[in-house]
Every structure is written in C-alpha cells, then in structure tokens.
Amino acid sequence: MARPNVTVIIDDQSFVIPGTESGGLHRAGFISDNALIPNLGTTAERNSGIMTIGSMGDWYGRLSSLDPIQSGLSAGYGGNHSSYGGTGARWPGGPTGAWEGEWWTVHNYLQYGGVAVVGSTGEEESTVGALDALSNKQVALDSVVAMSSARTGLTLGGVLVGAKYYSVVGDIANVNTVVNARLDCIGVYPHKEGETLNDSWTDAAASTSITPNEYAIAVYGAKRFLGTSNDADNDVKELNCAPDVAGCLARTDRESEYWFSPAGFKRGDILDSMRLVYNPTDAEQDEMYAQKINPVVTFPGEGTVLFGDKTLAAATSTLSRINVSRLFIYLKKIVGSAARSLLFEMNDEDTRNAFVNSIEPLLERIKGRRGVYDYKVVCDESNNPGSIVDVNQFVADVFIKPTKSINFIRITFTNVNTSVDLG
C-alpha cells in the first residue's frame, strides 16, 4: 500500500479567446439542425428554441462552464443537457460532434462584434422549429447566415491537418425560407453548396436554392484558420466566408451607417485568415461579379477583403447593391413602425400632416448622414381622394434617391509638353 500522500491536479479547461471587434448591435440569425441549443443552451433557451450570444466570451464560455440544468438562469452556459451526455459535460478541447461546424460558423461571425441569434429545429422541450422561430418578426434580425453543418477531413500535401466545414442544400434552403418569409433582413450565402465549392473557380452560377432578389447576397470564398488555442492539435479549420461577410455588415452598422457598403478596405476586412482556399484571378472576379457573386480576395501586402457589394436583384435596379437594399430595409422598419401609430386615427388632413412631419426629419437625418441624395413625401388629397378615404385607407408616397456606392474608378494621366499652360 502506498504511503499517505496528496495529489494536486491542474485541469486546464480555459480558452484563450481570439482578438475580436466589439460593441455592435447587428443581429444575425443562424438556423441549427444539429442540436446547438440542446448542447450549449440554458434551460430557458432550450424551452424557447432561441439562443442569443452577445460576445465571443459567451460563446467560448458555453464550451467550458457547467450546465445549470434546471435553473436556466444567469449561470446557464455550456455542458450537455443530461439527455445529451450527462450533467456538466464540457468540451475543453473545442467543439465536437454533429454541431461542430455550426459552432465555428457562429464563431467566425462573432469575431466582428455582432449579436448571434441561433434558432433550433424542434429540439429539446421547444415545440417551435427554427424556421418558424426565426421567421417570426418579433425576433429582430438584420441578417440570416447559412450554416456550414457538414464536416470532412482537411488534407494538405497528403497529410490530414484539420477539418473542412461546408454548407449543404438544406443549410441554404433554410436561410432562403426565413429571409423570404420576413423580407426585412439580408440572407448571406456561400454562392453554392458542397465540399469542393471553393477549391477552384469552375462555376459562377449561384445555388438554385437561393431566390434571386434584393434580400440575398452570394459570396465566393473560403478561408483557413486555426482552431481553439488550448486544442492540443491546434489543427487547421476551413470554412466559407459567409459568416465573415455578415460580420462585415455588423462592422458597417457599428462604425458607419446601415446604408454604407460593407465591401472594400475600410469595412470589408476579413479577420483571422491564414489564407484563402483559392484566390480568384482578375478574370474570374469579373465573371463572378457579372453573375452577382461577391468574391473575397487577398491583395498581397494589403489584406483579405470582401470585394463586391451586389445583391441578387435584377442588374437594372439600384437595389442590386447591398447598401441601397439595406437602406430600404431600414426605411421599411422605421417608417412602418411610425405608420402603425396612425391606425384607427381620424383620416383627415391633420393626420396626414402629422405623418409627413414625423417622416421628413428622419429622411433629412439620413440625407445628412449620406444615405440619400434627395427625397420627397407626398401625403395629401392628391393621393388620398374621397374614394380612398371612404374605404378606410391612408396612402403615403415616399420618393427616394439613394446614395450609390463606387464600383468603378477611372483616373487618366495625360502627358503634356513643357510649354503647355496647366493653369
């Protein structure tokens, strides 16, 4: 028998959280088909089917903190519910299991300082599926991002070095369903589904699961990055840049305005990228952009950026640009809210004037913040004749000249003789 002794064990279940941006209010929705909420949610979140994550610290904390099981209160971080692997189970080496790719999708968005809203699909005590939960406009959303739910090994030079995550048809179709049910947020998609999506540029067409309209952004690009800092393998991860582009929207909302373009070197910088899986050539970028697909591009010495701001709307419309589309989404939310206050009021000149007086200052502020070139509000007897009033209707017409983003720059250098007067 061994002599009496004391054994001291140090069990490291901490995480070194990567550097992130912070302070944003942009709310991005994510649809989980692989039990993210049953594994990482509080009891209250499992009951509601909605999990809200406000920071990267919260997201990592859900991997390492004990599950309160039945309290569902402030201590409600990670750990499996008892039916999913035992009370207080943890994942000190990083996410594992069927929900691994979904965890990394949300992770890559949270780096940009936004708020993630995850909806489950009929898991645990929740009786409401994610599609219904996130389609409900009472859950405020600014964007919805396609999950990368599928996983395969990442092999470089014949050696297994990590994991590759990618979207399948269902991931894209889920986002399309929610976005087109709401019509008040932007859907951010990898341009197609599949494991070899971004290995090389072979097909410019967007997924047939995406409805082509001003509420959809298709993104070409996948990045490689390192796993969690205390993962013994610290292996390489590969995931498409759709969550990063949603992060660029969050950055734009925080640092500029809703109606600014999220692309380019000021607001479109892609974080935590070791390298892109494939960096498209100039000719390939031209082909993508002609088909309304926004490439993520690495410029040597300058960084990796979102290098396009098109939606999938018809090219003949100014709504084919992200900033214009988001301007009208913003107006729809704000003006729609103001208009609801008029319901059941008296349908007369005083009410019409009150509406105009409430809307014009808002539009003037947007104009001062570079969102519109000009505007006009018409709400009088010209569009509210007796025939409209008699059927209890109220009509307002708001004409907007939205500010456009710069997509093409032309600079001409002219060589002139010394004798030419340049004054």
Predicted regions and their residues:
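Structured, hydrophobic secondary-structure cores that serve as assembly/anchoring elements
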Residues: M1-V118, V139-G423
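A short, well-structured beta->alpha microelement
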Residues: V118-N136
